[in-house]
Design a protein with these regions (language model features):
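ABC ATPase nucleotide-binding domains
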Residues: 229-230
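ABC family nucleotide-binding domain
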Residues: 3-222
Length: 230
Protein backbone atom coordinates (compact mmCIF):
# COMPACT_ATOMS: atom_id res chain seq x y z
CA UNK A 1 0.00 0.00 0.00
CA UNK A 2 1.21 3.49 -0.80
CA UNK A 3 1.82 5.98 1.99
CA UNK A 4 -0.48 9.02 1.99
CA UNK A 5 0.35 10.59 5.36
CA UNK A 6 3.45 10.52 7.54
CA UNK A 7 4.31 12.29 10.77
CA UNK A 8 8.06 12.44 11.27
CA UNK A 9 9.51 13.21 14.72
CA UNK A 10 6.67 15.64 15.46
CA UNK A 11 6.65 17.68 18.66
CA UNK A 12 3.93 20.10 19.78
CA UNK A 13 4.33 22.67 22.55
CA UNK A 14 2.06 25.48 23.69
CA UNK A 15 2.96 28.62 25.59
CA UNK A 16 1.66 28.38 29.15
CA UNK A 17 2.35 31.26 31.49
CA UNK A 18 6.08 31.83 31.52
CA UNK A 19 6.84 28.34 30.30
CA UNK A 20 5.72 25.79 27.73
CA UNK A 21 3.38 22.82 27.85
CA UNK A 22 4.57 19.89 25.73
CA UNK A 23 1.58 17.92 24.45
CA UNK A 24 3.66 15.30 22.68
CA UNK A 25 7.22 14.78 21.54
CA UNK A 26 8.92 12.83 18.77
CA UNK A 27 5.77 11.30 17.29
CA UNK A 28 6.15 9.08 14.23
CA UNK A 29 3.32 7.43 12.31
CA UNK A 30 2.27 6.51 8.79
CA UNK A 31 -1.13 6.11 7.16
CA UNK A 32 -1.42 4.11 3.96
CA UNK A 33 -3.97 4.32 1.16
CA UNK A 34 -7.12 2.36 1.97
CA UNK A 35 -6.18 1.92 5.63
CA UNK A 36 -8.51 2.81 8.51
CA UNK A 37 -6.65 3.52 11.75
CA UNK A 38 -8.03 4.28 15.20
CA UNK A 39 -6.43 6.97 17.37
CA UNK A 40 -7.30 6.34 21.00
CA UNK A 41 -6.28 7.89 24.28
CA UNK A 42 -7.66 9.63 27.36
CA UNK A 43 -9.23 13.08 27.24
CA UNK A 44 -6.51 15.72 27.07
CA UNK A 45 -3.96 13.36 25.53
CA UNK A 46 -3.69 15.52 22.42
CA UNK A 47 -5.74 13.55 19.89
CA UNK A 48 -7.40 16.67 18.49
CA UNK A 49 -4.07 18.49 18.24
CA UNK A 50 -2.56 15.55 16.39
CA UNK A 51 -5.46 15.51 13.91
CA UNK A 52 -5.20 19.27 13.42
CA UNK A 53 -1.51 18.91 12.58
CA UNK A 54 -2.10 15.92 10.32
CA UNK A 55 -4.74 18.00 8.52
CA UNK A 56 -2.39 20.99 8.17
CA UNK A 57 -4.61 23.14 10.39
CA UNK A 58 -1.79 23.56 12.92
CA UNK A 59 1.97 23.51 12.46
CA UNK A 60 4.13 21.30 14.68
CA UNK A 61 6.67 22.98 16.93
CA UNK A 62 9.25 20.74 15.28
CA UNK A 63 9.23 17.76 12.94
CA UNK A 64 7.48 17.35 9.61
CA UNK A 65 4.11 16.35 8.16
CA UNK A 66 4.27 14.59 4.78
CA UNK A 67 1.07 14.49 2.71
CA UNK A 68 1.31 12.25 -0.36
CA UNK A 69 5.08 12.58 -0.20
CA UNK A 70 5.12 16.38 0.11
CA UNK A 71 6.74 17.93 3.19
CA UNK A 72 3.85 20.26 3.92
CA UNK A 73 4.05 21.73 7.42
CA UNK A 74 6.44 24.56 6.55
CA UNK A 75 4.93 25.50 3.19
CA UNK A 76 3.31 28.94 2.73
CA UNK A 77 -0.24 29.18 4.07
CA UNK A 78 -1.80 29.29 0.61
CA UNK A 79 -0.03 26.11 -0.48
CA UNK A 80 -0.96 24.26 2.71
CA UNK A 81 -4.56 25.33 2.20
CA UNK A 82 -4.52 24.06 -1.38
CA UNK A 83 -3.13 20.67 -0.33
CA UNK A 84 -5.64 20.41 2.51
CA UNK A 85 -8.64 21.21 0.31
CA UNK A 86 -7.57 18.81 -2.42
CA UNK A 87 -6.48 15.93 -0.23
CA UNK A 88 -8.11 15.92 3.21
CA UNK A 89 -11.67 15.68 4.50
CA UNK A 90 -12.66 16.36 8.12
CA UNK A 91 -15.46 15.07 10.34
CA UNK A 92 -15.81 16.53 13.83
CA UNK A 93 -17.75 15.56 16.95
CA UNK A 94 -20.02 18.57 16.37
CA UNK A 95 -21.45 18.49 12.85
CA UNK A 96 -21.14 22.26 12.14
CA UNK A 97 -23.88 22.10 9.50
CA UNK A 98 -25.26 25.41 8.25
CA UNK A 99 -28.75 25.62 9.81
CA UNK A 100 -30.29 27.70 7.02
CA UNK A 101 -29.45 25.09 4.35
CA UNK A 102 -30.96 21.65 3.86
CA UNK A 103 -28.97 18.41 3.88
CA UNK A 104 -28.22 18.44 0.16
CA UNK A 105 -27.26 22.11 0.16
CA UNK A 106 -24.81 21.54 3.02
CA UNK A 107 -23.03 18.98 0.83
CA UNK A 108 -23.33 21.00 -2.39
CA UNK A 109 -21.85 24.22 -0.99
CA UNK A 110 -18.24 23.06 -0.33
CA UNK A 111 -18.13 21.53 -3.80
CA UNK A 112 -19.16 24.80 -5.42
CA UNK A 113 -16.59 26.68 -3.34
CA UNK A 114 -14.01 24.29 -4.80
CA UNK A 115 -15.17 25.23 -8.32
CA UNK A 116 -17.56 22.42 -9.21
CA UNK A 117 -20.66 23.21 -11.29
CA UNK A 118 -23.91 23.20 -9.31
CA UNK A 119 -25.50 20.35 -11.27
CA UNK A 120 -22.46 18.13 -10.77
CA UNK A 121 -22.26 19.08 -7.09
CA UNK A 122 -25.95 18.30 -6.60
CA UNK A 123 -25.57 14.89 -8.22
CA UNK A 124 -22.63 14.02 -5.97
CA UNK A 125 -24.50 15.23 -2.88
CA UNK A 126 -27.49 13.09 -3.81
CA UNK A 127 -25.27 10.05 -4.39
CA UNK A 128 -23.41 10.38 -1.09
CA UNK A 129 -26.48 11.10 1.01
CA UNK A 130 -28.40 8.23 -0.57
CA UNK A 131 -25.47 5.89 0.09
CA UNK A 132 -25.56 7.02 3.73
CA UNK A 133 -29.28 6.26 4.01
CA UNK A 134 -30.57 9.82 3.65
CA UNK A 135 -32.09 9.66 0.18
CA UNK A 136 -35.48 10.67 1.57
CA UNK A 137 -34.07 13.49 3.71
CA UNK A 138 -32.29 15.62 1.11
CA UNK A 139 -34.48 18.69 1.61
CA UNK A 140 -34.57 18.53 5.42
CA UNK A 141 -32.71 21.19 7.37
CA UNK A 142 -30.40 20.14 10.24
CA UNK A 143 -33.06 21.01 12.84
CA UNK A 144 -35.36 18.46 11.19
CA UNK A 145 -32.78 15.67 11.36
CA UNK A 146 -31.81 13.39 14.23
CA UNK A 147 -28.30 13.53 15.68
CA UNK A 148 -27.25 10.48 13.72
CA UNK A 149 -28.67 11.90 10.50
CA UNK A 150 -26.88 15.20 11.07
CA UNK A 151 -23.60 13.37 11.46
CA UNK A 152 -24.22 11.39 8.26
CA UNK A 153 -24.66 14.70 6.42
CA UNK A 154 -21.36 15.85 7.91
CA UNK A 155 -19.70 12.68 6.62
CA UNK A 156 -21.12 13.27 3.14
CA UNK A 157 -19.86 16.85 3.22
CA UNK A 158 -16.37 15.67 4.18
CA UNK A 159 -16.28 13.24 1.25
CA UNK A 160 -17.90 15.48 -1.36
CA UNK A 161 -14.65 16.80 -2.83
CA UNK A 162 -13.18 13.29 -3.09
CA UNK A 163 -10.32 13.54 -0.59
CA UNK A 164 -7.59 10.92 -0.33
CA UNK A 165 -7.50 11.15 3.48
CA UNK A 166 -10.34 11.35 6.00
CA UNK A 167 -9.60 12.69 9.50
CA UNK A 168 -12.39 12.20 12.03
CA UNK A 169 -12.32 13.58 15.58
CA UNK A 170 -14.72 11.62 17.83
CA UNK A 171 -17.32 11.51 15.01
CA UNK A 172 -19.82 9.57 17.15
CA UNK A 173 -18.93 11.12 20.51
CA UNK A 174 -22.21 13.03 20.87
CA UNK A 175 -24.43 10.08 19.99
CA UNK A 176 -26.03 7.35 22.07
CA UNK A 177 -24.35 3.92 21.73
CA UNK A 178 -26.89 2.43 19.31
CA UNK A 179 -26.90 5.48 17.03
CA UNK A 180 -23.12 5.74 17.28
CA UNK A 181 -22.73 2.16 16.09
CA UNK A 182 -24.92 2.78 13.04
CA UNK A 183 -23.13 5.99 12.10
CA UNK A 184 -19.76 4.31 12.58
CA UNK A 185 -20.80 1.42 10.32
CA UNK A 186 -21.85 3.91 7.65
CA UNK A 187 -18.60 5.84 7.99
CA UNK A 188 -16.45 2.73 7.65
CA UNK A 189 -18.49 1.33 4.75
CA UNK A 190 -18.37 4.49 2.64
CA UNK A 191 -14.70 5.09 3.48
CA UNK A 192 -13.80 1.59 2.31
CA UNK A 193 -15.98 1.83 -0.80
CA UNK A 194 -14.13 4.97 -1.87
CA UNK A 195 -10.70 3.54 -1.05
CA UNK A 196 -9.82 6.31 1.39
CA UNK A 197 -7.25 6.33 4.14
CA UNK A 198 -8.79 7.32 7.47
CA UNK A 199 -7.48 8.29 10.89
CA UNK A 200 -10.34 8.26 13.40
CA UNK A 201 -10.00 9.50 16.98
CA UNK A 202 -12.35 7.76 19.38
CA UNK A 203 -12.69 7.01 23.07
CA UNK A 204 -14.81 3.94 22.21
CA UNK A 205 -12.48 0.96 22.38
CA UNK A 206 -15.06 -1.40 20.88
CA UNK A 207 -15.23 0.78 17.76
CA UNK A 208 -11.44 1.13 17.69
CA UNK A 209 -11.02 -2.64 17.72
CA UNK A 210 -13.03 -2.87 14.47
CA UNK A 211 -10.54 -0.77 12.52
CA UNK A 212 -7.45 -2.07 10.72
CA UNK A 213 -5.14 -1.09 13.56
CA UNK A 214 -5.05 1.20 16.57
CA UNK A 215 -2.62 3.83 17.82
CA UNK A 216 -2.68 4.74 21.51
CA UNK A 217 -1.68 8.31 22.37
CA UNK A 218 -0.53 8.23 25.98
CA UNK A 219 1.72 10.59 27.94
CA UNK A 220 2.87 12.30 24.77
CA UNK A 221 3.80 9.12 22.92
CA UNK A 222 2.17 6.97 20.25
CA UNK A 223 2.03 3.26 20.96
CA UNK A 224 1.12 0.96 18.09
CA UNK A 225 -0.38 -2.43 18.71
CA UNK A 226 -1.30 -1.64 22.31
CA UNK A 227 -3.92 -3.95 23.80
CA UNK A 228 -7.16 -2.01 24.09
CA UNK A 229 -9.57 -2.43 27.03
CA UNK A 230 -12.84 -4.11 26.03
Amino acid sequence: MSEVLRLENVTRRFEEGEGQLEVFSGLNMTLNAGEIVALVGPSGAGKSSLLHMAGLLEAPTSGEIHVEGVAASKLPDAERTRIRRQTIGFVYQAHHLLPEFDAAENVILPQMIAGKAKAEAAAEARRLLTTLGLGARLTHRPSQLSGGEQQRVAIARALANKPKILLADEPTGNLDPRTAGGVFDSLIAITRSQGLAALIATHNFDLAARMDRALLLHQGRLVEGAELPR
